[in-house]
Amino acid sequence: MEVIKAKDFPPNFVWLNTYEPLSLTRLKGYVVVLDFWTYCCINCMHMIGELSRLEHKYRDRPVVFIGVHSAKFFNEQDVKNIEQAIHRYEIEHPVVVDEDMAIWRAYNVNAWPTIVIIDPLGNVVYKRSGEGQSEFIEDVIDVLLDRYTGKVATEPIRYKPSSRDTNNRLYYPGKIALDAEYRYIAITDSNNNRVLIVRLSDGRIIHKIGNGMRGLIDGSIDEARFFRPQGIRWSKDDGIIYIADTENHAIRAIDLDNKKVTTIAGNGRQGYYSKGGYAKDVQLNSPWDLEIDGNKLYVAMAGLHQIWLYSIEDSSISPFAGSGYEGIYDSDLSTAEFAQPSGLSLHRGVLYVADSESSSIRAIDISGRRVKTIVGRDLFVFGYKDGSVYDALLQHPLGVDAYKDSIYVADTYNHAIRAIDINARQIRTIIGRKEGIECRLDDSCTLMLYEPSDVKYNPNDDRLYIADTNNHMIRVYDKESKVLSTMKIVL
């Protein structure tokens, strides 16, 4: 059998989460696990969770996990943005920034995520793409540790893990929702594993739902637990707040009158392909956003590249649109393709979808049961361009909100809020980041958006409310005065 020697890391590449750059020479005697990832990718997010469990298992053994960040999007090539992703996903292992995908090419990688395992002698012994392979990784590590007993390093590598900024009231807020009377805003405070209800008039927190600890626990709003929730919708009929509890792979319901949280779909385990069924028995896959229509709850099932439908009436859930193949393909509901749908908005019988990995806005005609693309072209065609929707470019949009003849878009990786004129078929930038301006938390007048994940229009005050995720803020844009301000949130 041919022995394949591992290629060392280029000497001048940037390293994060470690005191010093690493090399395979330095790591001789260790089992090295390389994770080729890019932080936009839902499968990579899942792999981070799988590797976290293994990291803790082998914490005191000569095993080193290294993230090789090989960026897909322009925005993901920025070191500061990669640092934000490390904080957001609580990555504890070293990460090397793979400039121009040099390490990717050296290892002949062709998909995210890909795992490569290197034995203590520096030979590649395992290479596989895709998620759901933690058991295989574990088996290989155990075999190598056993095979090289007495020949491996005696101490684990010590490195500098990322530390969270505890000075912010919010921590990577994901999505927002307004109540029926536009008096309150609900916020998924994702990395604090909770939901906040805030009064718009004075910014005062009225309810904190969730105790801040990770978990899938129902009960009182003080005892309940979430795990990085994202999507949120406030029912105009009964006041129930629905939550896409993303990393629990579940849908939760918050009853503010009775101060209770209930799981209505999912069982905490990640599922793959399913025809659906009784919602509590069905395994979901990273639900990222929700939209409500009477007794129907639409779910952006990012991990399956589909839109699902939950029936509030009979507690069933099943795929609604999308074949499950990742792509951008317009067709009928069953054969159309989505790519990590992450935002939903229902308007005039059309369900608009922020289809993040295809950098597009899609439209589902509910009665006609067809999918079409409003703006966007392909999985690898993205950028920043206003004008005709046929020529315009987005970059990994996560949020969408339609009102009258406009579709507001949180164009996440362009750090912008865009508006699509449905009739004129034109797109323009409402809020954008100027060239060379850096985010400064001490100066709200010049603070630009930083990977905003959601936007909601409030017709009562003609303002846009924005989940400014990486700035850990809720921003407010007055359309008349064209002033962007920061919402003051107080206890």
Question: How does the language model describe each region?
Answer:
Residues 120-175:
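Thiol-/selenol-based redox modules, centered on thioredoxin-like
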Residues 186-191, 241-246, 299-303, 353-356, ...:
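Conserved beta-strand positions in repeat-built beta-propeller and related beta-rich domains
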Residues 46-88, 99-103:
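Structural microenvironment flanking redox-active thiols in thiol-disulfide oxidoreductases
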Residues 154-174, 202-228, 260-286, 316-340, ...:
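Gly/Pro-rich loop segments of beta-rich domains
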Residues 178-182, 234-238, 292-294, 346-348, ...:
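Residue-level detector of Asp-centered blade-edge/turn motifs that repeat once per structural unit
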Residues 1-24:
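N-terminal "domain-start" segment that seeds a small globular fold
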Residues 23-42, 65:
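Short active-site neighborhood of thiol/selenol oxidoreductases, capturing the structured segment around
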Residues 83-111, 116-118:
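Short, internal strand/loop/helix patches
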